[in-house]
Amino acid sequence: MFSIGSFIILFDEQGRVLLCHRRDLDLWNLPGGGMQSGELPTEAAVREAREETGLEVVIERLVGVYGKADKDELVFAFTGRVIGGRLLPTDEADECRYYAVDAIPANTPPKHVERVHDALLFATQPVFRLQTALSSLQWLQSLQTKGDQT
């Protein structure tokens, strides 16, 4: 089945990016997730930000549209701005915090890091990219396998 995801990239005044630590996996992600039926990508990004962080946000611009070679999935990434709410633990994320772009945790999937870099590098027009990185779960499993071998 084909799925569509939507993520939001939020920078604070110091240029740090907001990441959320997932409850189900030991990963830091950008706020975002799957779109609901009848929902626009912008609406999904705003909803996911609220559900995962407790923050109210507005969309500023489209960063990129990403396909995945091994999955029937399309992902939208936007930058946004916080207009209200406050960071809270949620059902989906046990912690959200801002990180300097050069200090993003090692357990952040490469595809999320790539989207952050795209937000910084391609400020005038969106990027359209096929992301070849492993899925978050596959990537985490590969890290665990490497750890078991050492």
Regions found by a protein language model. Name each.
Residues M35, Y66, V82, A93, ...:
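Hydrophobic pocket-lining residues within nucleotide cofactor-binding pockets
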Residues R16-V17, G85-L88:
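Short helix-loop capping/hinge motifs at secondary-structure junctions, enriched
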Residues L10, A77-R81, R97:
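Short, well-ordered beta-strand micro-motif
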Residues D12-E51, T150:
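Conserved Nudix-box catalytic region and its N-terminal flanking loop in Nudix hydrolases
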Residues D26-L27, E92-T150:
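Nudix hydrolase/Nudix homology domain
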Residues G33, R47, E60, Y99-D102:
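Structural detector for helix-capping/boundary residues
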Residues G54-R86:
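Active-site segment of metal-dependent pyrophosphate-handling enzymes
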Residues M1-V17:
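Conserved N-terminal beta-strand and adjoining loop/helix that marks the start
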